Amino acid sequence: MHELSLAGGILQLLEDAARRERFARVTLLRLEAGKLCGVEVRALRFALEAIASGTCLEGACIEIEEPEGQAWCLQCNAAVALAERGAPCSGCGGYRLQPTAGTELRVMDMLVEDHWCPE
């Protein structure tokens, strides 16, 4: 389950930002996990909630958007929607596809409380 490792990386980014920007906690975290990025969104949410205790993420609302996959078909030279990796081109049925969208995993934005108390 690589989602736990990804959640740890996201939490580290948030903790680093909290120290640097001097905010106390995240109240809303918005992520984007494209349909082609290879992340199970429910598992990522579970992992984030599981490791949030005692951190700036504890109690935060976590929203994860899942943009659709898009690809360029090298056989029929067309942009096509792609529901999952390994799916054929919806136009020609070919498999020579270059993903162009839906592969991202990123922090979109966050809402924070700025009651900073240095340790």
Swiss-Prot record:
GO terms for biological process: protein maturation; protein modification process. Ni(2+) binds at H2. Keywords: Metal-binding, Nickel, Plasmid, Zinc. The keyword Zinc applies. GO terms for molecular function: nickel cation binding; zinc ion binding. It holds the Pfam family HypA. Transmembrane segments: none annotated. Zn(2+) binds at C73, C76, C89, C92. Involved in the maturation of [NiFe] hydrogenases. Required for nickel insertion into the metal center of the hydrogenase. Belongs to the HypA/HybF family. This is Hydrogenase maturation factor HypA.
